């Protein structure tokens, strides 16, 4: 089997981490928002209250497409390039010039660095990949918890079961 250069593995892990960090920003914003929307919707249905316009619309990790929270302008794919787009846009929405939180590039950078450290420590192995997945979950949960004091079951339960399965596989193999 061909051995990969450590520097290349670390660089690829850094790039992957930046991309995953960009996705984690979506998770950090949308998972708690989706929970709140579902709770309100369920409460209104239980109380037989009328729904306001747009309340029943689909909202999840993928829908609606990314947009500026201030002016609701759609974000183009090039505006989602981790860190680089933040620098090119000077930390502002292209349309309304509202400030973009510094947390977005920080989450991307943190995730990229953590992935790079995992690759440096474990190399191109399944252990590195599982450490990256575990780290991505933890980063998302840290920021969600900091914002809302919630740890959503959508994140904690897969992490728990994944940890159990990974440990059993390592133990049995």
Give the residues covered by each predicted segment:
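A membrane-topology feature that recognizes alpha-helical transmembrane segments
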Residues: 1-173
